[in-house]
Amino acid sequence: MTHQTHAYHMVNPSPWPLTGALSALLMTSGLIMWFHYNSMSLLTLGFTTNLLTMYQWWRDVIREGTFQGHHTPIVQKGLRYGMVLFIVSEVFFFAGFFWAFYHSSLAPTPELGGCWPPTGIIPLNPLEVPLLNTSVLLASGVSITWAHHSLMEGNRKHMLQALFITISLGVYFTLLQASEYYETSFTISDGVYGSTFFMATGFHGLHVIIGSTFLIVCFLRQLYYHFTSNHHFGFEAAAWYWHFVDVVWLFLYVSIYWWGS
């Protein structure tokens, strides 16, 4: 590394890919044990090792990029391409759920009663909690943009305030979604409506939790002065992800809650 004559980051050997793979094996095996034998010990072990791996791996990435200066402009360009491709893969992930929903709803089979929602299903009112959830996520999209512009202008105080508001709105959305699930009259096992509804909105809720975690890490990093107006890709990637989550929810609201009800 001392005689490096190029701008690329030659990554040092790391144990985290191996521990990450092992934790994934433990989690998938643990899920099977939980489903079939009602034992959560293997799942808990896998989840714990996965969390530890993520923490230590991203800790190393922060050290390399923030303190050791390995994230040169050309490395950041590669990271940007990687984040864009990751979000594109997520788009296709959710496209599968929308495909399943529209495939079932546009031509409901006789088993469903020939109508949508299927006979016996009482859908949620789209003008109640779902509309509030939409307002909350749209407001969080505004506040994350405010945080980004504040960071670009070097206004640390406003950046922290806007980021805190965004995190609070994300947590509020998650609580609203949980309360909505608690009040539904149908379950994930209630045919194709229940399965598509809970899979699509559930995975979106998981993405909101992941995005909120990203933003909390960015908030803590900003407290320690990790970001500058021209070197803040970690925050930028989290903001892109949050906007993606925001847009997916709009499609979910229009498709499943409003049109689908």
Curated annotation (Swiss-Prot):
GO terms for biological process: mitochondrial electron transport, cytochrome c to oxygen; respiratory chain complex IV assembly. It catalyses: 4 Fe(II)-[cytochrome c] + O2 + 8 H(+)(in) = 4 Fe(III)-[cytochrome c] + 2 H2O + 4 H(+)(out). Keywords: Membrane, Mitochondrion, Mitochondrion inner membrane, Translocase, Transmembrane, Transmembrane helix. CDD domains: Cyt_c_Oxidase_III. Residues 35-40, 106-128, 184-190, 257-261 are mitochondrial intermembrane. One of its GO terms (cellular component) is mitochondrial inner membrane. SUPFAM superfamilies: Cytochrome c oxidase subunit III-like. The chain crosses the membrane at residues 16-34, 41-66, 73-105, 129-152, 156-183, 191-223, 233-256. Its EC number is 7.1.1.9. It is found in: Mitochondrion inner membrane. GO terms for molecular function: cytochrome-c oxidase activity. It comes from the Eukaryota. Belongs to the cytochrome c oxidase subunit 3 family. This is Cytochrome c oxidase subunit 3.
